[in-house]
């Protein structure tokens, strides 16, 4: 009898322990460039107002109404609705059941692109709120691109292209789009010389591939290092499609740039990885480019940068990295040529 009562008590307590929510398993990010730009501009314009309208919220409301298509007209209406006194739940009514998904998904894609940062120019630090992520190709270097996400690839096995290719010149400096930790650096039979950088919030994994033969990476860069948005990380090339290391086997010089979303660590390397189309994000970043220069001693970032939103991270042994300014990490470096 006592055992029966104990069983009943345990069974009754089960509902009090909520089950862990399943992580998002798929994101189809198809927000048009014009909609991204409009939502971002509203976010920036209202940053210091009494009611700050987040571009994530704008896009999530629009996505609920349009099944993720987010045409500009819908985004404008969503922004106008959110400027009022109603909450997203009141605005959306029955469609609110989709809101948490789109809010989480879009925050995972865009969460590290907008925020507070500071740039040093003429010996003075100037802080601002706005687009703090950078275009992956350094300022002053030409490029061309098109929306090629999902195109077929055949090396090794038939598959879809899960990134975005930017064509350019051999040796073009490649910079980090967003700050984070270098998780992978070295050779891959598909991507050639490549770098993988995990965002500080761990939700985005940025992949930069087909880097230059012989000198693919910023000198001294290694696994575990901290990089900030706009930092030099490598040089454009055409390596890859080979089991033999340091081989040029890609016909056209280009950068393969990709973004993987990770809602749970089990998604990092699996058969159902979540890679999103970054074409319109790259277009959004095109007017925000980092300037680097070649000096007698190596490569140098012209305008030092500080991310004012990120907690302090301690680099793993690279003395070129420094931290400070109210514990916000920043980088003012010279990479020495070897």
Where are the regions a protein language model picked out?
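Cationic-aromatic interfacial patches
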Residues: 3, 18-100
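Hydrophobic core
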Residues: 9-13
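Surface-exposed, glycine-biased beta-strand/turn segments
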Residues: 85-193, 229, 282-338
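Structural recognition of the beta-strand scaffold that forms the well-ordered cores
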Residues: 165-167, 174-176, 196-198, 205-209, ...
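Zn2+-dependent peptidoglycan hydrolase active-site motif and core
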Residues: 177-220, 244-252
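Conserved, short, structured surface segments that act as functional micro-motifs
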Residues: 225-297
